[in-house]
């Protein structure tokens, strides 16, 4: 028989920072005719929430995050996610994918409209290099090697 654990006693022994406040955010981003955008909506030491927009045809290259889990939820458009072995998942509005740390992936905006995604990241340990290519070397997100292209906004058009 397992001993009973008194949750209240366990919680009393934990220190709580009473100064911590919630962070409110809104899912809004300008749509793009070219390139990509990436904005942090809220974050803590362990988690980040970002909204990403990729113009039609926008993409990145196969990479992994050695210390960070990622979850993507498609808000608008179509995303084609590909893995290290060539496996493919086509995701549309309100569908998502969880990519554990170390999982290689890439994605592209596959539909006729810009791709808008919510990205939630979680990591316990901070590493000097947070994104690596297939060769195991650093692959900065905003680099030509990662097919980065600055976003060109479509005047007056937003996802919200």
Tell me the role of every PLM-derived stretch.
Residues 53-55, 64-81, 120-123:
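Short, conserved beta-strand element in jelly-roll/cupin
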Residues 37-47, 56-71, 85, 93:
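A short beta-loop-beta micro-motif enriched in histidine and acidic residues
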Residues 1-48, 61-62, 132-160:
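A short, N-terminal "cap"/entry segment at the start of jelly-roll beta-barrel domains
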Residues 93, 108-109, 129-130:
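Short glycine-/acidic-enriched loop or helix-start segments at secondary-structure transitions
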Residues 71, 98, 113-131:
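A short hydrophobic beta-strand segment most commonly corresponding to one strand
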Residues 85-101:
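Short acidic-glycine-tyrosine-enriched beta hairpin
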Residues 62-63, 81-82, 99, 105-111, ...:
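Short beta-strand His + acidic residue motifs that chelate non-heme Fe in jelly-roll/DSBH
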């Amino acid at each position: 028989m397992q001993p009973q654990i008194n949750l209240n006693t366990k919680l009393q022994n934990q220190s709580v920072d009473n100064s911590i406040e919630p962070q409110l955010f809104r899912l809004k981003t300008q749509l793009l005719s070219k390139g990509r955008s990436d904005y942090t909506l809220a974050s803590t030491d362990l988690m980040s929430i970002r909204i990403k927009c990729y113009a039609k045809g926008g993409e990145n290259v196969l990479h992994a995050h050695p210390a960070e889990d990622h979850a993507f939820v498609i808000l608008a458009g179509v995303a084609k996610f590909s893995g290290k072995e060539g496996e493919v998942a086509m995701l549309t509005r309100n569908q998502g994918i969880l990519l554990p740390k170390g999982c290689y992936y890439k994605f592209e905006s596959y539909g006729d409209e810009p791709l808008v995604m919510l990205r939630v990241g979680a990591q316990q340990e901070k590493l000097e290099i947070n994104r690596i290519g297939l060769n195991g070397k650093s692959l900065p997100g905003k680099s030509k090697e990662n097919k980065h292209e600055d976003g060109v906004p479509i005047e007056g058009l937003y996802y919200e």
